[in-house]
């Protein structure tokens, strides 16, 4: 039966007479059937990747590509006068993640299935995700981001598990979402929910009764933690995830012959950041119910579990007040106390304790003590963990520490989102890179081929025009496609330093007003959400939106400079932005970004990186060579030294540098105050002068010089720019998540064995 016949059988009428919605549902059903055919029996050890987030993006096209059906589907629809891209618009994007943590988890699931490794995800079925972002009068507003429909990819099962929270029993319902690999197997993303969730309790944006646990528990990812009820709700969420997940793991392992004593021969559990940390005491508790003594249970769990650290930011290393855990998970506290006592027999260093003198429970400490592996996610990040942030643990357990540099799935971030570049690459080097990303290096043979460089430029031009069309259609913004597309799209956080980009744009505004024109017109595009309670982050958004209005109203400046801020940035938007990018902004304060994966996606699609020596930027620089990347700013050692010395005083930089002072003072100048809100702008102005915790000002001048150099190279040396782009594409192979997952399996998981 051909594809057209399959679709007609499901719709019951000619394709030309079907709506896009009807065709979407038919395609969804075909994908489900074909995915089921690729499910393979599990032998040996199986991975359970537990994560609070899975930012999976829309699934239709990705699944069609991985199943080898994309071209067939597109042609069958085109023959009936239908456009697959229109049908893709019908699909809601799953609201299951927010930033890099969740996107990494999604890439890892793709690579596990592609490499034919048995590995499932475990998480929660959020109804509204983080939030839907909109801008009103230059201010971020948050609303629910619904995505669940009667025909969701996540299928309801009859499997339930009891979960005890604050002395009350809840019933966790399992939903299963098929994860297809590229020419590989089908694995599963297991998502848990409660049948009692009530979406109607949400009001006034994203406000809801945080104490109505039976109604609210899975409504939102990362509920607002600015009050105690919100913080406790996060503990409730985390325990629901790990308790239901642990019961699933034990049930599936037992069904395959596990007697619980040999759990580590059947299951490998990866704890993705600290949100799932309670799986350690929960598994010990459940094994105790199976008759296994505490000491043996600890050994079993330690051998089964591994931990990935994603941050050196103290605020992100979760420390829960003991009172919260006593209230929400009293059944775990005796176990956590025993684990703390056991850890104290291994070291007298109080700073490595699980329960500290202030009665806070350190989740990362529990992870490191009672898993067999702790990994960082980029070479620099891992070295900082070993030598600085987690040095005491490294001295205690040197054998546990290892690095696994993050990666991205090339199926979504090249084949799906940049079909023009994919076709050009296949024409030049064949299609082997689809499965073996290292084959991209073959492109280096064309580094001096003007015809090939010209084709790559034509691809970029077409992608920029496609983005311009999308921006006009979805954001009501018109952009100059001949300008440099300079993009910073990532979570809004001071350490990622969108405020540094802001100050550059103000500086450039002044330069243009003074007649010093840039080498090329610049369109600066931002995509970012700020956490609802993160005031300064929301002020940065307001400042950028206000500056965009000031520039747009100035005909002298707007010919050369434009700011675009994407509303509700998500995976779908990223798939539009990344192929069109010329200059990729990766400007976090050195030592603060664990890895980053946006840098890899932009590089793969032929953008050049403007960045600090932070996270995976270091390894990108090593791969492409310093002549093919724009590096600036302090080193991580210099930054750490400043923090240790405590001698950074932002006001001294403000007073001592006229350009810095002019840019900061513009925030509260006449033009900005006329277009924006004094409260937000003044608060950001004062923050930069009196605090600037992430050292924006010391890097400002170096940033201006390197960014101006990039614009000059783009305008004055187009052939050199094109060559740099080609080298970046060719050297991106190392950053495939297939490589990352193969290393995890080789060193930590040993799946299927």
Regions found by a protein language model. Give the residues of each.
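A conserved ligand/cofactor-binding region detector
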Residues: 1-753
């Amino acid at each position: 039966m051909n594809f057209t016949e399959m679709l007609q059988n499901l719709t019951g009428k000619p394709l030309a007479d079907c709506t896009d919605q009807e065709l979407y549902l038919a395609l969804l059903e075909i994908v489900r059937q074909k995915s089921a055919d690729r499910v393979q029996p599990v032998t040996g050890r199986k991975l359970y990747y537990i994560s609070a987030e899975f930012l999976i993006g829309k699934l239709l096209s990705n699944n069609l590509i991985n199943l080898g059906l994309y071209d067939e589907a597109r042609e069958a629809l085109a023959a009936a006068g239908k456009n697959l891209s229109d049908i893709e618009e019908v699909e809601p994007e799953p609201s299951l993640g927010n930033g890099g943590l969740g996107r990494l988890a999604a890439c890892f699931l793709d690579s596990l299935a592609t490499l034919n490794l048995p590995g499932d995800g475990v998480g929660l079925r959020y109804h509204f995700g983080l939030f839907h972002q909109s801008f009103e009068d230059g201010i971020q507003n948050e609303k629910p981001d619904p995505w669940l429909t009667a025909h969701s990819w996540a299928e309801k099962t009859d499997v339930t598990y009891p979960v005890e929270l604050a002395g009350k029993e809840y019933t966790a319902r399992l939903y299963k979402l098929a994860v297809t690999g590229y020419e590989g197997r089908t694995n599963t993303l297991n998502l848990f929910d409660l049948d009692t969730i009530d979406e109607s309790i949400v009001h006034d944006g994203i406000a809801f009764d945080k104490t109505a646990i039976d109604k609210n528990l899975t409504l939102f990812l990362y509920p607002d933690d600015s009050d105690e009820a919100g913080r406790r709700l996060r503990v409730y969420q985390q325990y629901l995830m790990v308790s239901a997940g642990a019961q699933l793991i034990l049930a599936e392992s037992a069904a395959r012959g596990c007697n619980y004593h040999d759990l580590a021969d059947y299951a490998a559990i990866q704890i993705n950041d600290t949100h799932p940390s309670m799986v350690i005491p929960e598994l010990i508790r459940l094994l105790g119910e199976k008759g296994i003594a505490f000491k043996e249970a600890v050994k079993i769990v330690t051998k089964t579990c591994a931990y990935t650290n994603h941050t050196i930011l103290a605020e992100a290393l979760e420390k829960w007040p003991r009172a919260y855990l006593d209230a929400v998970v009293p059944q775990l506290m005796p176990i956590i106390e025993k684990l703390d006592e056991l850890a104290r027999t291994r070291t007298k260093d109080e700073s490595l304790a699980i329960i500290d003198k202030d009665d806070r429970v350190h989740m990362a400490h529990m992870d490191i003590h009672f898993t067999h592996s702790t990994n960082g996610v980029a070479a620099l990040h891992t070295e900082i963990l070993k030598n600085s942030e987690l040095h005491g643990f490294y001295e205690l357990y040197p054998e546990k520490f290892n690095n696994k540099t993050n990666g991205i799935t090339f199926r979504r971030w090249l084949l799906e989102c940049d079909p023009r570049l994919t076709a050009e690459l296949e024409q030049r080097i064949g299609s082997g890179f689809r499965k073996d990303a290292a084959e991209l290096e073959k492109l280096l043979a064309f580094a001096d081929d003007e015809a090939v460089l010209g084709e790559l430029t034509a691809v970029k031009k077409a992608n920029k025009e496609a983005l311009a069309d999308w921006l006009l259609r979805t954001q009501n913004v018109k952009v100059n496609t001949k300008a440099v597309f300079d993009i910073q799209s990532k979570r809004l956080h001071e350490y990622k330093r969108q405020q540094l980009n802001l100050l550059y744009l103000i500086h450039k505004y002044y330069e243009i007003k003074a007649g010093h024109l840039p080498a090329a017109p610049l369109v600066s595009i931002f995509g970012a959400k700020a956490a609802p309670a993160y005031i300064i982050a929301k002020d940065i958004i307001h400042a950028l939106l206000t500056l965009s209005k000031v520039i747009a109203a100035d005909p002298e400046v707007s010919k050369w400079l434009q700011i675009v801020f994407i509303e509700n940035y998500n995976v779908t938007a990223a798939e539009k932005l990344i192929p069109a990018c010329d200059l990729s902004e990766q400007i976090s304060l050195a030592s603060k970004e664990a890895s980053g994966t946006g840098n890899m996606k932009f590089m793969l699609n032929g953008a050049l990186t403007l960045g600090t020596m932070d996270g995976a930027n270091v390894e990108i620089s090593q791969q492409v060579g310093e002549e093919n990347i724009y590096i600036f700013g302090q080193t991580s050692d210099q930054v750490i030294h400043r923090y240790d010395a405590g001698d950074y005083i932002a006001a001294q930089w403000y007073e001592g540098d006229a350009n810095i002072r002019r840019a900061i003072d513009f925030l509260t100048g006449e033009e900005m105050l006329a277009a924006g809100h004094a409260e937000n702008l003044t608060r950001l102005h004062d923050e930069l002068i009196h605090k600037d915790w992430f050292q924006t000002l010391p890097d400002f001048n170096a940033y201006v010089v390197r960014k101006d150099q990039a614009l000059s190279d783009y305008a004055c040396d187009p052939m050199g720019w094109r060559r740099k782009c080609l080298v970046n594409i060719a050297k991106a192979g190392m950053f495939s998540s297939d490589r990352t997952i193969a290393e995890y399996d080789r060193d930590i998981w040993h799946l299927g064995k």
